[in-house]
Amino acid sequence: MRLDVLEADTLVRVGWVDVWVSLYWDSPYYSEGGFTLEVRPTTENLQLLTEGRWLVRSDETPRIPMRICARANQNEDANLVLSGYPATWILTKRVSAAPIKGQNAEAAMRSLVAAAKPWPRLELGTAYGFDTTFDKQTSGGTVFAYCQTIGQACDLGFRIVLDGTGADKRLLFECFRPTFDPNNRYSPKWGNLLNAGWSFADTDYANVALVQGAGEGSQRATCWVGDVDSTGADRREIYIDARDIQPDEEKGETTASQSYLAKLADRGGQKLLAQLRTGSIEFDVDDDTLAVGDVLRVSLPQLGYTAMVRVADIITESQSSGTTRTIRLGTPSWHKT
């Protein structure tokens, strides 16, 4: 593996690194990701590895550039330590106030990127036509936060890939979602799920929200949202004070107007997005064919669980003792067996 170094704006290769003390490289599906690279503080490295430049792995397809965001030598050996993020970092530097609700997820992400102020060589890539709809509502924030919210709700990955060669290189934004390969089955009993670490929790899980807006006492605007037909132990409620949302008097809205109650329902839907069951599992594999976004069937017989789950991150760690790949799985849909 070699790390090519690209100029910040032109994307022209200005050098490469193939010797390091250590490398940590986290390739994400719809999260932040990042890297840390430690090298000797040679004159060549100090001049080559500067903030704003991009690192690209020679063994990676598609090529996902990582931006150098920070440099330091505050360590015992005074080595040069670099850290940064995938090219989707660009989207953290662009903001929007556009409301997104009931829209096609891929189209919504692409529209946000297209509407943002230009970034050198950043363009829209291929539209693959994913038909998932973002049924919730979100508004206000960085374009990255929008994409992350939409992606997590719709199981849709997003990335910025390096395309082209020489002076024709471009950064292309695209969505992606690999389909399930029945050969991707992992379990300790088959010897291909190693050093498994897991955690599950439903402490903060909620599926029904009682939202109250303007008004006082029995006249206060109130609505229920979520899985309102659920009962018993399957029903998990939260209360949301949305008094900050007021009727638009200029448009004749009152606390009983359907348009106003819809605003309260939207607030409830947004809050429920943050009240999910959590579950994660990490394990080591020797399978070099797995890629970010791949769907796996994972079994933990000792716990009586199986899950269909996506690869949320692939973490590559390289140092003098060798290279390891760790698979980090996203929040799965676990089922008792």
Per-region residue spans from a language model:
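N-terminal "assembly arms/tails" that initiate or stabilize quaternary assembly
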Residues: 14-54
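Short beta-strand-centered interaction patches in the first periplasmic/extracellular domains
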Residues: 76-81, 85-91, 126-206
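Solvent-exposed edge beta-strands and adjacent loop segments
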Residues: 1-30, 192-196
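Amphipathic, non-transmembrane alpha-helical segments in extracytoplasmic/periplasmic proteins
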Residues: 37, 84, 97-123, 136-163, ...
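Oligomerization/assembly interface segments of phage tail-like spikes and tubes
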Residues: 26-43, 78-89, 211, 275-284, ...
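Short amphipathic beta-strand and strand-loop transition segments with alternating hydrophobic
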Residues: 20-28, 68-74, 160-162, 314-316
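Acidic, small/polar-enriched beta strand-loop surface segments
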Residues: 2-3, 179-321, 333-337
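Surface-exposed cap/loop segments at beta↔alpha junctions
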Residues: 42-128
